[in-house]
Structure formats: C-alpha cells, structure tokens
Amino acid sequence: DVNWPLGWPVGGYPG
C-alpha cells in the first residue's frame, strides 16, 4: 500500500 506507516516499508513510502 501507499500509506504511512503501515505501507512502509511494505510496498509504500513514508509520506
């Protein structure tokens, strides 16, 4: 996912 913090580092970015 593209979400923070759950989407990072699992397929997203800290933003």
UniProtKB/Swiss-Prot annotation:
UniProt keyword list: ATP-binding, Chloroplast, Ligase, Nucleotide-binding, Plastid
Entry EC no(s): 6.3.1.2
Keyword presence, Kinase: no
Molecular-function annotations in GO: ATP binding; glutamine synthetase activity
Top EC category: ligase
Reactions mediated catalytically: L-glutamate + NH4(+) + ATP = L-glutamine + ADP + phosphate + H(+)
UniProt subunit comment: Homooctamer.
UniProt miscellaneous comment: On the 2D-gel the determined pI of this protein is: 5.7, its MW is: 42 kDa.
Known function: The light-modulated chloroplast enzyme, encoded by a nuclear gene and expressed primarily in leaves, is responsible for the reassimilation of the ammonia generated by photorespiration.
Family per similarity comment: Belongs to the glutamine synthetase family.
Protein name per Swiss-Prot or TrEMBL: Probable glutamine synthetase leaf isozyme
Species annotation: Pinus pinaster (Maritime pine)
